Amino acid sequence: MNQTLNSSGTAELALNHSRGSVVHAACLVLSSLAMFTCLCGMAGNSMVIWLLGFRMRRTPFSIYILNLAAADLLFVFCMAAMLSLETQPLVSTTDKVHELMKRLKYFAYTVGLSLLTAISTQRCLSVLFPIWFKCHRPRHLSAWVCALLWMLCLLTNGLTSCFCSKFLKFNKDQCFRVDMVQAALIMGVLTPVMTLSSLTLFVRVRRSSQQWRRQPTRLFVVVLASVLVFLICSLPLGFYWFVLYWLNLPPDTKVLYFNLSRLSSSMSSSANPLIYFLVGSRRSRRLQGSLGTVLQRALREEPELEGGETPTTGTNEMGA
């Protein structure tokens, strides 16, 4: 009898060890892919920031894209730093740096979500009420909205850090409440508004395109593609705390979900530059143009003429 129990216990230990090895290998692969994605994202977003910040004349919509690229760059940098620190033992100094990178990462995440919500909402308003929006839109609205969103996200994430950082006055109950409030803001306000405005924009532009037999503008494609990629790739990170606290999942499943959410969110923050350049070069005869030309073409609002070109008049006055 004892021999039977010992053999069954040994088999269970071997099974658990084998399962743990598989989970460890899967996490290692996901972390490696996330690191590679972050490096590509840093290169792509740095290129967008350099082009929009120093090589191109800014338009109202390009200001949003510039700030979104900055938020994405901060996110992938913090993610890459965390992945790098996790490959070595976390001593006192590296542990503090890891905590700082984690807080900055969530800050960049909320900034990116807020900017995408503002972009999709303003594009929706400009399509639903074009004359009113053009006449009543403040000249520096884009810059003011971006600055306000950065400050609000800094405030909310600063409060979260005060209650949840293990190097400050950590309180588990208060941290849980603050996390739930922030999750409710992300999942209950920002994400639904972004989704609803994007769906409205898609239906309205699609109907107008069928009625007037015109192709949608490249800017419309850029906005919808960016929102779609965010919803598919970045929402798993937003749902992470819900999965951690409310779903009674096995520890191995939670670890795999956590690593998968880090990879998918890294892909989301790295995909936007690729979207801009793919849309900017789509149906164009001048594929050999500079990167700045391709990016400028992707951010234009004007409908395309024959050959994939756009009118040159009023380019810098039109914005989203």
UniProtKB/Swiss-Prot annotation:
Q: How does it sit in the membrane?
A: Multi-pass membrane protein
Where is the protein localized? Answer: Cell membrane
Q: Does the keyword Transferase apply?
A: no
Q: Where is the composition biased (Low complexity)?
A: 308-320
Q: Which residues lie on this side of the membrane: Cytoplasmic?
A: 55-62, 134-142, 204-218, 281-320
Q: What is its main location?
A: membrane
Glycosylated sites: N2, N6, N16
Tell me what this protein is called. Mas-related G-protein coupled receptor member D
